[in-house]
UniProtKB/Swiss-Prot annotation:
It holds the Pfam family Ycf9. GO terms for biological process: photosynthesis; photosystem II stabilization. The keyword Endoplasmic reticulum does not apply. It is found in: Plastid, Chloroplast thylakoid membrane. May control the interaction of photosystem II (PSII) cores with the light-harvesting antenna, regulates electron flow through the 2 photosystem reaction centers. PSII is a light-driven water plastoquinone oxidoreductase, using light energy to abstract electrons from H(2)O, generating a proton gradient subsequently used for ATP formation. Belongs to the PsbZ family. This is Photosystem II reaction center protein Z. It is a multi-pass membrane protein.
Length: 62
């Protein structure tokens, strides 16, 4: 169970890092938002899901 928690935390950190870099780039590009809207929403949905997964796994470990 601990390894699943560690992998979920790593995935959350990796997704956060990717979103921190990619979202400003999407907004800075001329047609970025209209072309990459689905990618931003998918990444945000993945991030929210990982937050809940880490919270659930944390409650099971503690």
């Amino acid at each position: 169970m601990t390894i699943a928690f560690q992998l979920a935390v790593f995935a959350l950190i990796a997704t956060s890092s990717v979103l921190v870099i990619s979202v400003p780039l999407v907004f800075a590009s001329p047609d970025g938002w209209s072309n990459n809207k689905n990618v931003v929403f998918s990444g945000t949905s993945l991030w929210i899901g990982l937050v809940f997964l880490v919270a659930i796994l944390n409650s099971l470990i503690s």
